[in-house]
Amino acid sequence: MNAVTETVDLQAPPPVPLVFTDSAAAKVKDLLAEEGNPELKLRVFVQGGGCSGFQYGFTFDEVVNDDDTVLDKAGVQLLVDPMSFQYLVGAEIDYKEDLEGAQFVIRNPNASTTCGCGSSFSV
């Protein structure tokens, strides 16, 4: 009887990149149309501050840096710098409208705690 040996690669799967929802892309597209500058992209970043240690930020940017992560969705580009990306891997960037108002929302699986307003977190 012959033994069969099989090699199995047990490496962890690569991290899930950011999820940029259709709703968020549509809202950004509307905002960019209002700005009237086709070169603008949405930059999402993480910086120190907020009540939980880190906070999210959004800004429009014309410049794509060499080390940026770029996500394209529905004709909209989302930019994330490398430092921020490490905190956002696997996160979902969404836009919601409900009775509490309308806002961009980041659902981040890396955040161990978040504040009530949802704009700051800790890891």
UniProtKB/Swiss-Prot annotation:
Binds 1 iron-sulfur cluster per subunit. Signal peptide: none annotated. Keywords: Iron, Iron-sulfur, Metal-binding. The keyword Iron-sulfur applies. Its cofactor is iron-sulfur cluster. It comes from the Bacteria. One of its GO terms (biological process) is iron-sulfur cluster assembly. Homodimer. Required for insertion of 4Fe-4S clusters. This is Putative iron-sulfur cluster insertion protein ErpA. It comes from Bordetella pertussis (strain Tohama I / ATCC BAA-589 / NCTC 13251). The lineage of its organism: Bacteria, Pseudomonadati, Pseudomonadota, Betaproteobacteria, Burkholderiales.
